[in-house]
UniProtKB/Swiss-Prot annotation:
Role: Not toxic to mice when injected intravenously or intraperitoneally.
Main location: secreted
Protein family per UniProt: Belongs to the three-finger toxin family. Short-chain subfamily.
Pfam families, alphabetized: Toxin_cobra-type
KW Iron-sulfur (keyword) present: no
Protein name: Clarkitoxin-1
SS bonds (residue pairs): 3-24, 17-42, 46-59, 60-65
Keywords tagged on the record: Disulfide bond, Secreted
One GO location term (cellular component): extracellular region
GO molecular function: toxin activity
Tissue expression notes: Expressed by the venom gland.
Cited InterPro entries: Snake_3FTx, Snake_toxin-like_sf, Toxin_cobra-type
Origin species: Micrurus clarki (Clark's coral snake)
Length: 66
């Protein structure tokens, strides 16, 4: 799998994911002024919010899908 791992919203930096990490994800803070703190990368499963939902989380299973 190839996923983007850039933390900058408009920049794409594709990376080859380690074996077993077949999900691409993007975590974006819900508060708009903190959107630049987004995190993208590879995972073995889609990350989840904790007790309080502070991130919008998107996941997919195709190369460069987010």
């Amino acid at each position: 799998r190839i996923c983007d791992d850039s933390s900058i919203p408009f920049l794409r930096t594709p990376q080859l994911c380690p074996k077993g990490q077949d999900v691409c994800y993007k975590k974006t803070p819900i508060v708009k002024k903190f959107k630049w703190l987004q995190k993208k990368g590879c995972a073995s499963s889609c990350p989840k919010n904790g007790f309080i939902k502070i991130f919008k989380i998107e996941c997919c299973t195709k190369d460069n899908c987010i």
